[in-house]
Amino acid sequence: MGFTVDVAGNCLIGDVRLVLEGGDQGLCAWSLDGIDSGGGIDGLATHRAFGATPAAPDRPAGGRHPNGVVAIDHVVVTSPDPVRTINALQAVGLEPRRTREHAAMRQTFFRLGPTILELVGPAAPDGDGPARFWGIAFTVADIDATGRFLGNHLGRIKDAVQPGRRIA
C-alpha cells in the first residue's frame, strides 16, 4: 500500500510509530505515552510507552511514504457501550473533547497528542462486549496524487464535512 517500513517492522508516520508484527490483521494493540492502563482499556489491548517518539534531533518525525501519507489523522474505536468506554478512557486520564449524537449513533472525540481518537457506538448501550479497534484515517500531502498511486485501492475522493478538506 506504499508505506516505508524498516527491517525491524517500524513504520514512522508523523509523530506515531507503527510496529508491524505478524499475526492478526489490522490494529491489535496500541501504546500510549505516559498512560498506565494495566494492559487494557475496556478491551483495547494497551501498553505503556515511556517517552517513545520516533523523532530524534538527527531525524525528523515521520518517514517518506510513496503513498503520500504524512500523519495519522485519527484512530477509530467502536463500542457497544460508549458510556462505559468513555469512563474507562477517563480513568486513565483521557478526556472527551466533543460528542456528536445523531440518529441512533454517538461519536466522542479525544485528543491523543496530534492524533484524534474517535469512539463510535450506539446512542444507548447495546450489549456488554468490549471496545474494538475499527480503523485508522491518514492525512496525505496530496490526495489526488495518493489516489493516482493507490488506484482502485482507494475509495472515491469527495468533499469532507470540514470546509476545505477532502476525503476518500
Label the predicted regions:
Residues 1-97, 111-168:
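Glyoxalase I/VOC metalloenzyme domain signal
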Residues 101-104:
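Structural preference for solvent-exposed beta-strand-turn elements
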